[in-house]
Amino acid sequence: MKKLFVALGLVMGGLHVSYAEPASAQQVPGYYKHQFGNYRITSLLDGTIYLDPKLFKNLSQAEKTKILTKYAAVNEKGIQTSVNAFLVDDGKSLTLVDSGASSCFGPQLGSIAKNLELAGYQLANVKTVLLTHLHPDHVCGIAKDGKAVFPNATIYAHEREADYWLNPASEKTVPANQKENYLGTVKNIKAALAPYEAKKAFKTFKDGDVIQGFEVINTQGHTPGHHSFRLKSKGQQIVFVGDIVHSHSLQFDAPKTGVDFDVNSEQAINTRLKMFAEISNKQQWVAAPHLPFPGIGHVYKVNAEQYQWIPLYFNNSLEK
């Protein structure tokens, strides 16, 4: 018996000595499935970025700090922001709303395609990609190394959005201090769309259109052709809002807070106020690319001036 205890002691001691920290700090795959009526919506995480608080306008630094402290969102790296996309499965076809940044914003983003496959889907089976607008963190994910990531998909953007970024005449309307950023964005957009334009798989839509059951909603301001998409099923509604909001803390508590990269700040703020009021009043679901992953939830009206983001409750199995 004594020999047994000695042997066990040696074994346990060996286990203690050989223990090592995990080699990777990577989290679990970034996808979450949500059953919305007859549709299965899979949130896909592209990654996380940090925005400089100075990018948010109409609030003093003291006011920003107060709100961020209230929501335990103070971070020396900046204001944490998710980049999400949403895959909608109607049982017959797959529609992707926005596509992430691929490599356009560096290595911290670019996981949409990988997470889509980890969720059990195939890139070749995506038939439609709806783009709320053409900023790189929404369009770059459709291509990689000059090739289509979704080889059988048709890409859609609003006609005004396409005109603003792809019509050479639009450059003349851009202020001189913004022209460099504008031209850099145009370069990324053209590179992303090129493999689809080559096979005539890039199309534009207009106000009032319905694409694969998605109703087009005019939410311009962030960009001239920014649009959201509404889907209805079994008495419920969900709105894929795009970039009407970039911070779950600042812009719900103070919705008149703009961001520096809104093309038309006043219009973007008015759009946000209108959409927050409508979404909260009708208790619509929201799917948002820049709210904390999985980016699905509701908007609650606190008072005449403030709102609150209510994320969905995590469920370890799909409810039918």
Where are these regions (language model features)?
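Conserved beta-strand hairpin/beta-sheet module of binuclear metal-dependent hydrolase folds
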Residues: G30-A119, S228-I244
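Cap/insert and terminal regions of metallo-dependent hydrolase folds
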Residues: K234-K320
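Active-site metal-binding loops of divalent metal-dependent hydrolases
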Residues: D46-G47, S99-S102, L134, R160-E161, ...
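Active-site metal-binding motif and surrounding structural segment of the metallo-beta-lactamase
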Residues: G91, P107-Y156
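Metallo-beta-lactamase
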Residues: E21, G110, E117-Y121, N125, ...
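Gram-negative bacterial Sec-dependent N-terminal signal peptides
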Residues: M1-Y19
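Active-site environment of divalent metal-dependent phosphoester hydrolases
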Residues: P29, D52, L134-G141, T223-H227, ...
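Cleaved targeting-peptide boundary
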Residues: A20-Q27
